[in-house]
Structures are given as C-alpha cells and as structure tokens.
C-alpha cells in the first residue's frame, strides 16, 4: 500500500485533488491510501506523532506556513518521502529542489499531467521498497 498525504489550504484545490486521486486510484487500480490536510502545521503534527507517507503533495503558498518550510521540517523526520510541490507560481521552483523535491507541478492541475506524474512517483515508491 502506498501512503499519500496532500496539504492545500484552498478548498477548491482540496476537492479537485480528492477527486483526481480517487479517479487515479480507480483507473489505475492503484493500492493508494490518501490523507488530506488543510494546514501544514496539522501535517507536521501527524508526522511528528509517527505518521509516515510515501508521497506528499504540498501547496507552496499557504498562510500558516509555506510548503517549502514545511518540507524542510518534514525532512528532519523522513529523508525518503517523495515530495511534489503544487503551486501557481514558478518563483519557488529552485528552492523546492534544495529540499529534495520529486517534482514541482504548476496549478491548475490537469489530469493529463497529473496522472503520468503519479505513475512516475508510484513507480519510484515501488523501486524504493525493493
């Protein structure tokens, strides 16, 4: 089972990701468990309490704490999680790779770009398990 968490404060993006991930899971018959967070502080609290994920989808621009800062903190607990940043701005692309981002996906999120990215990161997770 691949464990994925996503964190985005925008309710519309939150709903869109939920629908896309469900469609992906159904179409690809993916063994994927998804957990949603609206705040990076809640995600960090879960990780600090022992939750582990294989894939994280993080919004970059959030009010409580930005996704890049959250990723730096997450890396203190988990060096191997595949982090994909989601944002409407290219401004933080270089900085995202400093924290070991797997990918930097620009919003809006479209199925034709999201599904191949998910295929790639799911394959990377399978390779990491071997």
Which stretches of residues belong to each language-model region?
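Acidic, metal-coordinating helix/loop segments flanking the phosphotransfer/catalytic sites
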Residues: 36-55
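Two-component/phosphorelay signaling modules centered on CheY-like receiver
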Residues: 10-35
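C-terminal output helix
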Residues: 109-120
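The feature encodes the CheY-like receiver
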Residues: 62-63
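Active-site residues of response regulator receiver
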Residues: 8, 58-59
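Acidic catalytic/metal-coordinating carboxylates
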Residues: 39, 66-69
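Short amphipathic alpha-helix used as the core "switch/output" element in two-component signaling
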Residues: 68-79
């Amino acid at each position: 089972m691949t464990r994925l968490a996503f964190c985005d404060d925008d309710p519309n993006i939150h709903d869109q990701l939920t629908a896309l991930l469900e469609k992906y899971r159904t179409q690809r018959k993916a063994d994927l468990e998804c957990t949603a967070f609206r705040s990076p502080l809640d995600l960090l609290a879960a990780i600090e309490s022992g939750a582990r994920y294989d894939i994280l989808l993080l919004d970059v621009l959030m009010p409580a704490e930005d996704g890049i800062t959250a990723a730096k903190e997450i890396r203190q607990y988990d060096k191997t999680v595949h982090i994909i940043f989601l944002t409407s701005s290219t401004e933080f692309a270089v900085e995202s790779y400093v924290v070991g981002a797997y990918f930097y996906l620009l919003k809006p999120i479209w199925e034709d770009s999201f599904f191949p990215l998910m295929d790639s990161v799911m394959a990377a997770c399978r390779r990491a398990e071997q």
